Structure formats: C-alpha cells, structure tokens
Amino acid sequence: MGAIVLVALMALVASSSAFSDIEHNIMKLEGENIISSSSTPNDDQSSFSDGTSDMVESLFLNSGNRNLVLMMLSGRPQPNGRCIGDAQPCGFLVSDKGCCDPNYCSQYSKGKCICVPKGQPCGLLHFCCLGLTCDGSFNGTCK
C-alpha cells in the first residue's frame, strides 16, 4: 500500500506545472528520517502556492515505509545495521533493505548491489568502491 501511495504522489508532483521550477535535493539521511529541501531560483524561498514543496517534503518525512524510501533513493544501509551484501539481489519487490556501504542497487527492480570501480563514472547515487572517491557530485570519476 505504501509503495502505491509513493508512486501516486511522485506522479502527481511530476505532473504539476510548478514542479519544473523545483530543484529538489536530498540533503541528508539521518536515522530513519529523510530530510529534504526544495528551492526555486530567483524566489524568496517561501512555500509554493500549489503546495508542491509541502507534498514533496511530506512524502519523504512521513512515508509509512521509510526503509523502502531509503532503499529507492540511495541503496544505503538501514539504521538497524542490516543490509544486502556485494552482488546480492536488491531493489523494489526484492527486499526492503538497502545495500551495504558503499554499494548501491544497480536497478530499482531486480538489481544487484554493486559499487563503481576505479576510472568509471560516479555521482550522487552511484558510489565508488571502498578506498576510492568520486571527484564530482553528478558527473565524476572514481579515483
């Protein structure tokens, strides 16, 4: 039920005309709460008249299935310490646990927990293997 609500809300937000003005950034994962911020360029940072930012924030902060939201966003391990190991199946409909650090799930559905090797592209949701760092936030390379 929580997944259906999540998909419905994401579709509603994506179809909103104000959504094109939103730059949505995941700021931090902290315990079981996902903290997000929404902003518009050249705006006074006040809330949107159509309630879009409130809807997005509510989706992330008050989701009934935080483990699923965490896993779908980043594949990071859950606060209780349980996670999916290297090359193990992961994704929506497979498990509500995330991949062990620094791995991420290769696909939202029926993926495998992997990390990005040296010299390969990395970024916000594609983490480098242990001992490597990504030199860019979105279009970096593991070094």
Swiss-Prot record:
Main localization, broad class: secreted
Residues making up the propeptide: 19-80
TM segment ranges: none
BP GO annotations: defense response
Domain of life of the native organism: Eukaryota
One GO molecular-function entry: toxin activity
Comment, domains: The presence of 'disulfide through disulfide knots' structurally defines this protein as a knottin. This toxin contains 2 'disulfide through disulfide knots'.
Function: Plant defense neurotoxin that causes pain and systemic symptoms in mammals via modulation of voltage-gated sodium channels (Nav). Potent modulator of human Nav1.5/SCN5A (EC(50)=55 nM), Nav1.6/SCN8A (EC(50)=0.86 nM), and Nav1.7/SCN9A (EC(50)=208 nM), where it shifts the activation threshold to more negative potentials and delays fast inactivation. Also shifts the voltage-dependence of steady-state fast inactivation of Nav1.6/SCN8A, but not that of Nav1.5/SCN5A or Nav1.7/SCN9A. On Nav1.7/SCN9A, principally acts by binding to extracellular loops of domain IV (Nav site 3).
UniProt name for this protein: Beta/delta-urticatoxin-Uf2b
Organism this protein belongs to: Urtica ferox (Tree nettle)
